[in-house]
Amino acid sequence: MSDESPIIFTDSCCAKVADLIAEENNPDLKLRVFVNGGGCSGFQYGFTFDEIKNDDDFEIEKNGLVFLVDPMSYQYLVGAEIDYTESLQGSQFVIRNPNAETTCGCGSSFSV
C-alpha cells in the first residue's frame, strides 16, 4: 500500500519497530496491531509481532516495514495514527483514534 494508508504509522513508531525487529534478529517479523473486547472502556488495543500474514489481513508498508491489521480491527482503526512516545513517565506506543468516543486514563482502551 502507499503512504496514503487510512491507518498512519509515524516515523517514530517505525523507528521503534525497526529497533525491536533488529533486537529479535528476525527480518520476517511484522507488527500486528489489533483491537479486541476488554479493558475498562469496552475495547482495547494490542500489539504483537507475527511472521505470518493471514489471507484477509490488511498489509500496510512504511519505511521498509510491514504492519498487519485483521479485518475486524481495521474498521475500528481507520483514520488512526499510531505513534511511539518517550517521556518521563515511560515509553509506549500510542494510538490516536478519531473513532474512539471515550478512552480510559491509560489510553489503552476505548469505546465507540
UniProtKB/Swiss-Prot annotation:
Ligase listed as a keyword: no
Biological process annotations from GO: iron-sulfur cluster assembly
Needed cofactors: iron-sulfur cluster
Transmembrane segments: none
Domain of life: Bacteria
Entries under InterPro entries matching the protein: FeS_biogenesis, FeS_cluster_insertion, FeS_cluster_insertion_CS, FeS_cluster_insertion_RrpA, HesB-like_dom_sf
Keywords per UniProt: Iron, Iron-sulfur, Metal-binding
Cofactor note text: Binds 1 iron-sulfur cluster per subunit.
Disulfide bonding pattern of the chain: none
GO MF, one annotated term: 2 iron, 2 sulfur cluster binding
List of residues binding iron-sulfur cluster: C40, C104, C106
PANTHER family with a match to the protein in the record: IRON-SULFUR CLUSTER ASSEMBLY 2 HOMOLOG, MITOCHONDRIAL (PTHR43011:SF1)
Subunit structure: Homodimer.
Family in the record: Belongs to the HesB/IscA family.
Biological role: Required for insertion of 4Fe-4S clusters.
Name of the protein in question: Putative iron-sulfur cluster insertion protein ErpA
Chain's gene name: erpA
